[in-house]
Amino acid sequence: MSQVAAESTAGLDQQFVGLDLKSSDNQNGGGNTESKGRYIPPHLRNRETSKGVCDKDSSGWSCSKDKDAYSSFGSRDSRGKPNYFSDRGSGSRGRFDDHGRNDYDGIGGRDRTGFGKFERSGHSRWSDRSDEDDWSKPLPPSERLEQELFSGGNTGINFEKYDDIPVEATGNNCPPHIENFSDIEMGEIIMGNIELTRYTRPTPVQKHAIPIIKEKRDLMACAQTGSGKTAAFLLPILSQIYTDGPGEALKAMKENGRYGRRKQYPISLVLAPTRELAVQIYEEARKFSYRSRVRPCVVYGGADTVQQIRDLERGCHLLVATPGRLVDMMERGKIGLDFCKYLVLDEADRMLDMGFEPQIRRIVEQDTMPPKGVRHTMMFSATFPKEIQMLARDFLDEYIFLAVGRVGSTSENITQKVVWVEELDKRSFLLDLLNATGKDSLTLVFVETKKGADSLENFLFQERYACTSIHGDRSQKDREEALHQFRSGRKPILVATAVAARGLDISNVKHVINFDLPSDIEEYVHRIGRTGRVGNLGLATSFFNERNLNITKDLLDLLVEAKQEVPSWLESMAYEHHYKGSSRGRSKSRFSGGFGARDYRQSSGSANAGFNSNRANSSRSSGSSHNRGFGGGGYGGFYNNDGYGGNYNSQAVDWWGN
């Protein structure tokens, strides 16, 4: 037994010696001659004869160092060295490698290729190997992505009228406006994407806002609904990011990643009041960041938080967010605003109406965001009442006030009709309007309550109309599906509450119907602004009865301002309402005074410290002075058609103006 055991032990020792690569190499003088019976694992066979070839070992791809600086995927090391992974013996397996390269080790990382895509491996670290590259150079095109982003765009048909829209810019040293996109340097990427988007001419707000933002001036812009405000701030912001690169934000992200955290530091932040508007801005940002290294993200309430966090962890340079969800992400440690250079508040008055002021101040003033004067801040909206201009005093530094068109007014591209309809007759009147509308035309019907939206949708469905509805009680998925069906024309009638009234860009809406008029005139402005967008012509019809007497005067002012036909009964009611209310003091409507309609610094005089009241630097183009708060003049000359009367059942009236 002892002899057998000894022989067995000797046999095992001999086999181990045969497996010892180093002793075997030494015995053979380091040559390639193999001992008889020596076992070589498959992954090590012919290793010595494969120098200069990338072999996949157990730790990843290991490439020879004499390979060209560009990998087969088009990615490039930031110092011209090849993009290869270290061996198991010296690699850090996904941890931060601080030895000679300021980047994550490739093992288990997500390597960013030349087109900005990510490759996942075992761990989820983010490796941006193009951090020192020139961000102003476009990446290779993608036919699939280009088709996805730019296939649905369309341009307006009434841009000639934009030349007559009055524009007023107030503030020190206002940069001159542009007439064409080519008049200002925005870089190769932006100009290419403008061409893909089929934008031929800038709108008035774009003509003035783009050079102001490019000069890094703070801006408060008040422009008509549907005038192109989104592109007015995205184009210059992205252009500047492409020129400046990521700066300290990328370095901070990497330093944070050393300790296993995945906090993102966006360079630009856009705040929006609603989920729908946030998604819309995000989609526009995707278009203008095409072929760039900038990665936009969007976060909003009512959607899966985990999925939004995963999307953020892939990288975020431009963030579009609703205030509530952004505060949540900041408290979770997923978002840091330490290096935010650009802050945009879109539909700022709507955010205040929805009670977001505490969250906005928490984001801007009580966290790590750079202070005003260091960051670049812009506020955009269709209306700017007193509360918003007071917010501007706190957030903006030496800003320029830009009033494009008649502030708080409606577009002349929209034909407005007001008809007297009793409450019980509304549904039958609505059916008459829908029957007069072409089958391919999109119609948006606004109601005041969620219950009313569901009820009207059921009624139209029973009448065999293809319709859908959205309101605040619907899930985010249901709302997105409803908007998709409406945009695509599968269900050309959308019944909505005010949740869809602000900021939604559904470009080919032909007809907006106020089944229920809102209680304030500003909501009316935003509702009818869903049609007649960016140069297109549209129609807005409002059902008026005794329940709407509170907005009679403001509605009359608005119709006069937009040079619309005014029913004689509405003029009479406004006259009576005016004298009934005169004994109670001056109207508090935003349209009765100049505060919300012009630069607060000019109307308040020297009583407000911190505001520049120098009127000599005001610049004006294409229009006359504003002498009624938002433009226009007296009532004279606009009431030539007193026979309007609101009787639209007559065959002599062509509803569409043909």
Swiss-Prot record:
Comp. bias (Basic and acidic residues): 45-69, 94-129
EC number: 3.6.4.13
Tissue: Found in heart, brain, liver, skeletal muscle, kidney and testis. Low expression detected in lung. In testis, expressed in all types of spermatogenic cells including spermatogonia, spermatocytes, spermatids and somatic Sertoli cells within the seminiferous tubules. Also expressed in Leydig cells and other interstitial cells.
UniProt motif (Q motif) ranges: 179-207
SUPFAM superfamilies xrefs: P-loop containing nucleoside triphosphate hydrolases
One GO cellular component term noted in the UniProt record for this chain: cytosol
Pfam families registered for this protein in UniProt: DEAD (PF00270), Helicase_C (PF00271)
InterPro entries for this protein: DEAD/DEAH_box_helicase_dom, Helicase_ATP-bd, Helicase_C-like, P-loop_NTPase, RNA-helicase_DEAD-box_CS, RNA_helicase_DEAD_Q_motif
Positions carrying Phosphotyrosine: 104
MF GO annotations: ATP binding; ATP hydrolysis activity; RNA binding; RNA helicase activity
Function statement: Probable ATP-dependent RNA helicase. During immune response, may enhance IFNB1 expression via IRF3/IRF7 pathway.
Protein name: ATP-dependent RNA helicase DDX3Y
